[in-house]
């Protein structure tokens, strides 16, 4: 008969936080490098012999909203925090059940007004300080940021106008319909947006597509699948990572997340579209 495993050693000075689902791995939290180091995250619901009320906090992810209520904890204490955590849009996981009214104490989401921010990405300056996302972002002057010769060379060798890699078709944001209308306008300038992935007849491996965008495309279509406030996903990064300007489409104020808003004088004039066409044909 195998020996009974020892009871886990619980430290009074630590906060124990239970992740209700096994949806996210604990190492995700380690990567956040939180300055508070007395918190212990766990998936072990039996840490207190099944008494969930003993945890200092419980994280519930978006999938909890789809669970029958009998699968959720019943007993809780007034000092215990129930935290709703998600990086998914509210359209995909709406919290419409009356059961969840006054159920959560805190939120941990991509929303800028969340109790705990959980964005898809952060923007740092050259010294490592986080600039965005934030309600009031102080973007540095672009003139103070040097452009390396390597970047200039990559941009000079591009030949295609815009591309898009997409796998989720017929999204709630109607981005497919918007793209169709945009293609109609670009046709008059002999330009087009090349679409790759599950929603197109053109397929390529992810790594091959990334190399192609880096080599060929000036612009990348960063279209979100939902129009939600502050919802900015990694799609913007696909443009930046491939030395392409992301063209954004979503419900967020992108100047709070990833893009410095230019003055109206610096916005592209209609004749510049024609200039891009001529450059492509040279």
What are these regions (language model features)?
Residues 1-84, 95-282:
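Pol beta-like nucleotidyltransferase catalytic core
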Residues 87-91:
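A short, histidine- and acid-enriched strand-loop-helix "catalytic/donor-clamping" loop
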